[in-house]
């Protein structure tokens, strides 16, 4: 049984570009400055259940509730026009989805084990309320309800454990964003994610409380599902966390805390 809250998608960018083209007004050229910004994100609240029919095999499922809002803005400023054209869009999301997973544990020796696993995320259509405002010499505002897709995805990975104290894991995940529609349009690219993690448990049966605390470190590398100047941005996220035992026994209760710090790639253009 698990319950958690985590970010699903975080949007945060601000970039600009300049284009020069022949002017239809004068004999010279016309310079246009474009600016694009985006901020906000979608959060996932999940509730999970697991079942182990055999000592070497287990399966589970998560029910996921998504909520949040994202604000997009784009503007075009023309050299010979004093009033820029600005488009602002705010999208609010609330909906449910789910995923499934299986894992197999292979005992290597008495003190070592290898666990292999896989996950599958359902493709789901998400309800969204959107407000769009276009500002020129006049202001036009629209409110509409529509839907867009969250992609199907699959993941696979392994976990190696030694002495029930040292654990290292690696996961690979592929999200099929190129198959989804965003307000009727397909405008994204598939996204890959690589995740590496390490966990240390000083003494599973120790008397001292902090000997039974789990200490965790991790990193993941991924590409964005959108492009900037024709390039996908790389993202690196570093994390650290702790698992605090609340109850001993064959099925212990553990409260987990995780902190993450992320770095997004930069794209330079003219």
Could you tell me what each predicted segment is?
Residues 2-270:
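Outer-membrane beta-barrel porins/channels
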């Amino acid at each position: 049984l698990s319950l958690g809250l985590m970010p699903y998608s975080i949007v945060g960018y601000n970039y600009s570009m300049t284009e020069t083209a022949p002017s239809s007004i004068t004999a010279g050229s016309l310079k246009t400055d474009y600016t694009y910004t985006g901020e906000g994100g979608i959060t996932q609240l999940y509730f999970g259940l697991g079942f182990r029919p055999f000592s070497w095999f287990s399966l589970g499922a998560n029910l996921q509730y998504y909520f949040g809002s994202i604000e997009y803005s784009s503007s075009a400023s023309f050299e010979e026009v004093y009033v820029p054209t600005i488009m602002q869009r705010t999208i609010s999301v609330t909906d449910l989805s789910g995923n499934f997973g299986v894992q197999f544990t292979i005992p290597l020796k008495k003190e070592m084990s290898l666990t292999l696993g896989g996950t599958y995320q359902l493709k789901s259509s998400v309800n969204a309320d959107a407000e769009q405002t276009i500002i020129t010499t006049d202001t036009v505002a629209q409110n509409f309800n529509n839907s867009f897709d969250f992609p199907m995805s699959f993941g696979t990975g392994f976990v190696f454990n030694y002495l029930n104290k040292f654990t290292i894991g690696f996961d690979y995940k592929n999200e099929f964003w190129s198959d989804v529609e965003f307000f009727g349009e397909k405008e994204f690219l598939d996204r890959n994610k690589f995740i590496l993690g390490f966990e240390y448990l000083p003494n599973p049966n120790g008397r001292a409380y902090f000997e039974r605390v789990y200490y965790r470190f991790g990193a993941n590398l991924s590409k964005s599902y959108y492009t900037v100047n024709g390039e996908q941005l790389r993202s690196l996220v570093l994390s650290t966390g702790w698992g605090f035992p609340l109850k001993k026994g064959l099925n212990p209760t553990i409260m987990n805390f995780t902190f993450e710090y992320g770095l997004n790639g930069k794209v330079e253009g003219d």
